[in-house]
Regions:
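Divalent metal-binding pocket/active-site signature
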Residues: 137-139, 150-233
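N-terminal hydrophobic targeting/anchoring segments and the immediately downstream early-domain regions
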Residues: 1-176, 230-365
Length: 365
């Protein structure tokens, strides 16, 4: 039985508004653009994304099956790149997203605001938003940041796996102990533009520093709870508490080494060349535990979904592509999540945060 049918049977007396909220899943992070670079050098004539495509997590039929009505498409340049090379690769990624959307106008609609997300949903199309992954892609230039915004980018992850010159990464040796003065300027300019400040990938000190600087709600586009799995990419409880005070949202990733402590240990062994043991199984309930934890610490208004599909070589077997969101939502329903709360998780919270960022930009004039 589909998750929506389960909820309507279990919560049949809830409001029609709450049920309508369930029709919308807005995911915070998907790396299809990079997967297509690797698969076919962005050539949409070689890979038909209107059909099921083996070897990747994402295509239009599976987005439809997963009840996805909004997607932040990550535009990514490896953090080993810098300067003009990182800018060019990022622009190529933006170009791919825009061509992808234009190629399938009956299924996809470019969105740059909360109202455009809602309008796309009303027209039966998947709202397609753009998120920059890694502040190295602006080459230490607020002018480049502004151009990226003009091309449709509506969030920027401040770092990727390596430090930016102005912000420390979670997975690199700390240099600054937070943001530099230019890093603070980046956050303020993002506020002025209406771009969401994304704190996935950054060090815990940058998380705290950025939350102290930003005038608009921040996001974690694809992270989990560090109290459950103690890896640098996850979010400590004190930061979740600060995020709630900020009005922001932590969008939970499906990446197994963020979700499961045994898998994180196994994954670390693989990276060190230790072989022989099979990968621990990561379940839907493991992921649901992180969502429950963020709700319990930060509140129902501050949790969302950011799967990171096509951004990880591993995914939980039950959540192995974009068609599988209903399995997660059914598991949460079985735990007692109401239709209204599931609506906040799926779309209500991120739409609120988008609107708040827009309001902050308008207040800046």
């Amino acid at each position: 039985m589909q998750w929506r049918a389960v909820w309507r049977h279990t919560h049949r007396h809830d409001s029609a508004h709450a049920v309508r909220l369930l029709d919308v899943v807005i995911d915070g992070h998907n790396d299809l653009a990079w997967a297509m670079r690797q698969l076919c050098d962005y050539d949409l004539s070689m890979v038909d994304l209107s059909q099921s495509v083996p070897g990747i997590h994402t295509d239009i039929p599976r987005l439809r099956a997963g009840e996805v009505s909004g997607q932040f498409w990550s535009v990514y340049a490896p953090s080993t790149l810098s300067g003009a090379e990182a800018v060019v690769v990022t622009l190529e990624q933006i170009d791919f997203v825009r061509r992808f959307v234009a190629r399938f106008p009956g299924d996809l609609a470019l969105a740059t605001s909360a109202d455009e997300v809602v309008a796309a949903r009303a027209s039966g199309r998947i709202a397609s938003l753009i998120g920059l992954e890694g502040g190295h892609c602006i080459d230490e230039s607020l002018g480049v940041l502004r151009i990226m915004h003009a091309l449709g980018a509506r969030y920027m992850t401040l770092t990727h796996n390596h430090n930016a010159p102005w912000a420390d990464s979670a997975t690199d040796e700390p240099v600054l102990g937070g943001l530099s003065s230019f890093g603070e300027d980046v956050v303020r300019e993002m506020n002025r533009l209406g771009m969401l400040v994304d704190l996935s990938h950054v060090s815990a000190d940058v998380m705290r520093h950025a939350l102290a600087v930003t005038a608009a709600p921040a996001i974690f586009s694809h992270s989990c709870a560090r109290a459950l799995v103690d890896v640098p990419r996850n979010v400590p409880d004190d930061v979740l508490t600060a995020l709630a005070a900020n009005g922001g949202i932590c969008m939970i990733a499906f990446v197994p080494d963020f979700v499961s402590a045994p898998f994180a240990t196994w994954f670390g062994e693989q990276e060190r060349g230790v072989v022989g043991s099979p990968a621990p199984v990561v379940t839907v309930d493991d992921l649901a535990d992180h969502i429950d934890h963020v709700r319990d610490v930060a509140g129902i208004d501050h949790v969302g979904i950011g799967g990171d599909f096509d951004g990880s070589a591993y995914m939980p077997p039950e959540l192995n592509d974009v068609s599988t969101y209903p399995r997660l939502l059914a598991a949460l329903s079985a735990r007692g999540w109401t239709p209204r709360d599931l609506g906040y998780l799926c779309s209500g919270n991120i739409l609120r945060v988008l609107r708040a960022a827009e309001d902050t930009a308008h207040a800046h004039g």
